[in-house]
Swiss-Prot record:
Pfam families cross-referenced by the UniProt entry: Bestrophin
Keyword check for Transmembrane helix: yes
Gene Ontology molecular function, alphabetical: chloride channel activity
Membrane topology: Multi-pass membrane protein
Any GO BP annotation: bacterial-type flagellum-dependent swarming motility
GO terms for cellular component: plasma membrane
Name of the protein in question: Voltage-dependent anion channel-forming protein YneE
Organism whose genome encodes this protein: Escherichia coli (strain K12)
Length: 304
């Protein structure tokens, strides 16, 4: 995620980091070079009686813009829902530990439970990003718990099970009444709902056929556009063609990024920073001495 301060409008025009321009610059360069080639081809295809006009491109351009808008809205809706889910995880994690600490006597067991919560957040992050988990989770889980988690097809869900088992032990030992156990178990259900919601977004992409047809149409439009522009614009064709192509190609590229909000690209959610915030909050609630430093944006204003 790019977290930039407010900028002057003129300075913002030339921003590079965080813009999709860095990803599509090579495609725009090809469009520029192809437009130059079309200028030299103009006498040849005019001699053959081939004539392109802007009218069909105007109609097609409007249609593409509408469908790109729909796709970007769908991608942004996934992005917003994903952020809400992680916000719910932060709320549920704080509330669960607060209720445990105010109900049970402060002990090493309660601190262990807090580490299970931290492990869950990191495990969910790494699962969504398809990253290796063993090294990170080893800092928070006991050896036997770590082995159970890594052997599971759903590591985050296994950690939830271990948390549920911990609550059950406290209940059997008489530390929790039935009412308190049900209340705390409801918090675990809230966290489980977050897990299911994130999995729904991660494993249900926007239909491929819809993405493919829009992607093809955008690039065919950008390839054919110089033939229609060159008749009236001549040597200005490359510049106008690149400007129009930038609009369509950048929207297509941005939609691809928003479709998977859990990745590590510029416009994805800062899951590292969110997990870091959860860890800091839970450790401070337990009055731990060693607290990790807060993750801040880098020099390019990016949070991962």
């Amino acid at each position: 995620m790019i977290v930039r301060p407010q900028q002057h409008w003129l300075r913002r025009i030339f921003v590079w980091h965080g813009s999709v321009l860095s990803k599509i610059s090579s495609r725009l360069l090809l469009n520029f070079l192809f437009s130059i080639a079309v200028i030299f081809m103009l006498p040849w295809y005019t001699h053959l009686g081939i004539k392109f006009t802007l009218a069909p491109f105007s109609i097609l351009g409007v249609a593409i813009a509408i469908f790109l808008g729909f796709r970007n809205n769908a991608g942004y809706a996934r992005y917003v829902e994903a952020r809400k889910l992680w916000g719910q995880l932060m709320i549920a994690s704080r509330s669960l530990l607060r209720e445990v600490k105010t109900t049970l006597p402060d002990s090493a067991s309660v601190r262990e439970f807090a580490r299970l919560q931290i492990a869950f957040a990191h495990c969910l992050r790494m699962t969504l990003r398809k990253q290796p988990q063993a090294e990170v989770l080893a800092h928070y889980l006991k050896t036997e718990d770590l082995q159970r988690v890594l052997a599971s097809n759903s590591p985050a869900n296994r950690i939830l099970l271990i948390m549920g088992e911990w609550l059950a032990v406290q209940r059997r030992n008489g530390q929790l009444s039935d009412i308190l156990f049900i209340s705390l178990n409801d918090r675990l259900n809230d966290i489980s709902a977050v897990l299911a919601g994130c999995e729904r977004i991660a494993y249900t992409p926007i239909p491929f056929a819809y993405t493919l047809i829009l992607h093809r149409t955008v690039y065919l439009f950008c390839i054919m556009l110089p033939f229609a522009l060159v008749v009236d614009l001549h040597y200005m064709t490359p510049f106008i063609s690149v400007l129009i192509s930038y609009t369509f190609i950048s929207l297509d590229c941005l939609a691809e990024e928003l479709e998977d909000p859990f990745g590590t690209e510029n416009n994805d959610l800062p899951l590292d920073a969110i997990c870091n915030a959860i860890e800091i909050d839970l450790l401070q609630m337990n009055d731990e001495a060693e607290i990790p430093a807060k993750i801040l944006p880098d020099r390019h204003y990016q949070l991962t």
